[in-house]
């Protein structure tokens, strides 16, 4: 147990302080436990009663009502302006006992700023000060703030003092009891029994950070599209060589950091914008786009700088490299905060309830082995103190510095500046641009106004960086009264503090060495790089490059031509295959159709030998116009309608006084046609059972017209050949042109007539085909015309005889049968014989028509009607 140094001015209050110090240092009793007992047994009440008898004029400046302890009291002080107990500061075992009266003026809102020769180690293991105090606190947290707010601890190298306040209403300062054996992580070693009831404190903030970011959280850098294209070409040529990429425009101007370029390269590779294994064509294209000639070696353009990335990049990613390597952050573009552009962050052990970050400057002019930070923003844990105040730690001097301003404006060295706008703590006597927080020899205890009167002007802080961590003396005081001799720092039992010191020193030395030996990244010279901006139009348009472009264009045209040819060839092959396929389908359909037709024909031949339904044949155009006449004056259309009927005679009723009957022989494949027209004069020839050939059948009959009696003749047609095939598949006679028969051209004798009647409106749309032995019968008032349309009339083999009322005609099969033979090979005898019976005594002998209308093939005969007398059957007249 330590004995408190008691002065001659000892009174009841000093006794109370002595007892307080004595009891608070009882072993195995924490400040929290003692504080509970203190309030439980009326310690607060007894203290208030004891204070009633104390003369407030002792050691009090009556001019402003503030306690002035400049040379009055050395250890203890009480704020008499409001009667509130502010702080017990009984630092013992100090070398400076009541001689210097040095007091550090510290901010009380959200800040625990520990200064000169006071080994104040907070519960977050933050290295704050080196002192000669014998602290037996296992946690090395002799004093911390009692803030309920978690304020991040930042040690910054910027030239502005960032003070992040807590929202505390009470601003009591806490003493450091050096001989405290505190086994729990208590943030204060004394329990303040007073609470200030002043107005809510105003926040004093001068921030250097825009906030803390979460682990792995990065801001993305937006690269313009043009820069992305250039970056893709550079990655194809140089891969992930960030330092080489930064030698090219637009990346060489310091616009982007190495980490930003590296992250963007990884994102491009991951998203596939840059091929993993670029081909020679890709490399050639990238060269062309970047303006790098083919004769330039890529290796010569690479940066010669070795080692890891810049400290800024490596430090900024140290805490999140493992997280950033995941796929969630590979395409993140990280933009550092503009206010932290010259700083890097280093994670340090921190309280789980707070977020602290150590910020180290990169500027070598602001670095020293003993000066690291300007500001400390500290949020502490809990204590038995009932107020939400932030403790202010004093030096090892036995003086009390009680800053209890409601507005929290701190002015140093006799300056009554109220810095409410920028909230900077200004030290007018500092020789540097930064703001010192250490104010020695200040005994002002101002609780009523906003101005802290610093009565001692002997302190000129010459710290370049306003260091809070001091291994040597940080204050060079002009007066001997204010000098504090630094001592060797107490080695902490916590290994984390040592590691933190080593890391900080190592980081400082590393930054200094790199800044002194390695220049910042700048655009490389023309010896190892060809920046894009240096390539002029003259270089681009040199003959070699022009030839190269022409060659590349020719190659592109050639490749395009080959591609088009291949496409055309493929299309041609496809069309050929399609055509062959269609032809094959047509052939198969034709074969199937022929087979169906043959089966149908055979079936019809078996079932009905005399009635076969056949389809029209479009190829028989020669048979459509069977009869034409040269006499254009008597041309009339003949309509012939064909309808199948029973076996017998077909009747053609013409519009005039003539009837045209169609006859067919009785062969096996003969087809019978019945032509019906409007009812007019019709002629019917009875078919007797005699005077017919055994092989012929009576097709039709014609009655005599006029007044010639009732006798009738038999018209019979016989053939020596009976064919077992159908000579035609399809035949249609669409029109039978008018035919004029001149009776005088081929006949002579009595009773001949020049009267002729043309065939009018004969249209045949037969569903079946005519047999080669079929014929047409055309009868007028004066003549009977028989026409065989399927034979050639001018061949020598055609001859006819008329014997015993029977006209026998021997003709040659026309060329149409050659076409039939090609379709159905048969042994066809082209010469056939046709027998036609004489119509009767009312008709004269047959006369052959030697000339038929042009374009009509066949054989025609005329039988002239005899109205009076008998018929001369002399064949010689023919």
Swiss-Prot record:
This is Uncharacterized protein DDB_G0288805. Residues 64-213, 314-325, 335-355, 373-494, 596-605, 639-652, 679-704 have a biased composition (Low complexity). It comes from the Eukaryota. The lineage of its organism: Eukaryota, Amoebozoa, Evosea, Eumycetozoa, Dictyostelia. It comes from Dictyostelium discoideum (Social amoeba). Signal peptide: none annotated. Residues 615-624 have a biased composition (Acidic residues). Residues 585-595 have a biased composition (Basic and acidic residues). Residues 58-223, 306-494, 585-652, 679-709 are annotated as: Disordered. Residues 362-372 have a biased composition (Polar residues).
């Amino acid at each position: 147990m330590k004995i408190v140094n008691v002065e001659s001015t000892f009174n009841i209050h000093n006794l109370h302080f002595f007892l307080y110090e004595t009891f608070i240092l009882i072993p195995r009793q924490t400040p929290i436990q003692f504080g509970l007992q203190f309030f439980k047994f009326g310690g607060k009440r007894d203290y208030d009663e004891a204070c009633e008898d104390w003369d407030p004029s002792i050691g009090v400046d009556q001019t402003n009502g503030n306690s002035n302890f400049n040379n009055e009291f050395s250890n203890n002080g009480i704020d008499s302006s409001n009667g509130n107990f502010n702080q017990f500061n009984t630092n013992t075992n100090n070398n400076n006992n009541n001689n210097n009266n040095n007091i550090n003026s510290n901010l009380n809102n959200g800040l625990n700023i520990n200064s000169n020769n006071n080994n104040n180690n907070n519960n977050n293991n933050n290295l704050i000060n080196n002192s000669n105090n014998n602290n037996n606190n296992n946690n090395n947290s002799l004093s911390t703030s009692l803030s309920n707010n978690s304020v991040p601890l930042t040690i910054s190298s910027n030239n502005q003092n960032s003070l992040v306040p807590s929202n505390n209403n009470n601003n009591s300062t806490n003493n450091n009891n050096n001989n405290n054996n505190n086994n729990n992580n208590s943030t204060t070693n004394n329990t303040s029994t007073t609470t200030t009831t002043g107005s809510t404190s105003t926040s004093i903030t001068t921030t250097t950070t825009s906030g803390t970011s979460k682990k792995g959280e990065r801001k993305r850098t937006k690269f313009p599209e043009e820069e992305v294209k250039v970056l893709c070409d550079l990655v194809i040529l140089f891969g992930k060589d960030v330092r080489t990429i930064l030698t090219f425009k637009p990346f060489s101007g310091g616009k982007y950091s190495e980490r930003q370029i590296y992250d963007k390269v990884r994102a491009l590779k991951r998203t596939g914008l840059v091929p993993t294994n670029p081909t020679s064509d890709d490399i050639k294209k990238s060269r062309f786009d970047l303006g790098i000639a083919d004769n330039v070696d890529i290796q010569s353009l690479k940066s010669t700088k070795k080692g890891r990335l810049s400290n800024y990049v490596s430090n900024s990613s140290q805490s999140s490299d493992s997280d950033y390597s995941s796929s969630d952050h590979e395409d993140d573009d990280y933009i550092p905060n503009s206010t932290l552009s010259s700083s890097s962050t280093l994670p340090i052990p921190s309280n789980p309830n707070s977020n602290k970050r150590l910020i180290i400057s990169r500027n070598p002019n602001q670095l020293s082995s003993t000066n690291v930070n300007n500001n400390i923003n500290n949020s502490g844990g809990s204590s038995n103190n009932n107020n939400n105040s932030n403790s202010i730690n004093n030096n090892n001097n036995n003086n009390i510095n009680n800053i209890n301003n409601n507005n929290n404006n701190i002015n140093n060295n006799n300056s009554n500046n109220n810095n409410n706008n920028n909230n900077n703590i200004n030290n007018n006597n500092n020789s540097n641009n930064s703001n010192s927080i250490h104010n020695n020899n200040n005994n002002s205890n101002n609780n009523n106004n906003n101005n802290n009167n610093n009565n001692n002007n002997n302190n000129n802080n010459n710290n370049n960086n306003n260091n809070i961590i001091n291994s040597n003396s940080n204050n060079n005081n002009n007066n001997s009264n204010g000098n504090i001799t630094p001592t060797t720092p107490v080695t902490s039992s916590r290994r984390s503090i040592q590691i933190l010191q080593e890391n900080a020193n190592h980081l400082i030395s590393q930054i200094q060495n790199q800044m002194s030996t390695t220049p910042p990244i700048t655009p490389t010279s023309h010896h190892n790089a060809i920046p894009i901006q240096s390539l002029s139009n003259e270089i681009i348009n040199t003959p070699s490059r022009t030839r190269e472009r022409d060659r590349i264009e020719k190659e592109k045209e050639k490749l395009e031509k080959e591609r088009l040819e291949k496409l055309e060839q493929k299309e041609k092959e496809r069309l050929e295959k399609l055509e062959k396929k269609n032809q094959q389908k047509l052939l198969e359909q034709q074969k199937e159709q022929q087979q169906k037709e043959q089966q149908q024909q055979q079936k019809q031949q078996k079932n009905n030998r005399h009635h076969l339904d056949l389809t029209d044949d479009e190829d028989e155009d020669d048979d459509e116009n069977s009869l034409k006449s040269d006499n254009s004056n008597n041309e009339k259309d003949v309509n012939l309608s064909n309808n199948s009927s029973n076996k017998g005679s077909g009747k053609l009723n013409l519009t005039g006084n003539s009837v045209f009957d169609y006859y067919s022989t009785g062969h096996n494949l003969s087809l019978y046609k019945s032509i019906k027209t409007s009812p007019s004069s019709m002629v019917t020839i009875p078919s007797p059972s005699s005077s017919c050939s055994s092989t012929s059948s009576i097709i039709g009959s014609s009655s005599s017209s006029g007044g010639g009696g009732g006798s009738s003749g038999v018209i019979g047609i016989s053939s020596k050949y009976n064919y077992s095939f159908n000579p035609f598949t399809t035949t249609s006679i669409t029109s039978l042109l008018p035919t004029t028969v001149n009776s005088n051209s081929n006949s002579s004798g009595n009773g001949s007539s020049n009267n002729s009647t043309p065939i009018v409106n004969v249209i045949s749309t037969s569903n079946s085909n005519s047999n080669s032995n079929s014929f047409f019968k055309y009868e007028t008032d004066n003549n009977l015309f028989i026409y065989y349309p399927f034979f050639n009339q001018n061949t020598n083999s055609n001859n006819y005889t008329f014997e015993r009322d029977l006209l026998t005609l021997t003709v040659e099969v026309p060329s149409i049968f050659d076409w039939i033979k090609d379709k159905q090979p048969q042994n066809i005898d082209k010469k056939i014989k046709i027998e036609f019976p004489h119509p009767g005594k009312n008709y004269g002998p047959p006369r052959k028509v030697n000339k038929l209308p042009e374009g009509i093939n066949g054989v025609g005969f005329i039988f002239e009607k005899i109205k009076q007398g008998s018929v001369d059957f002399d064949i010689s007249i023919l």
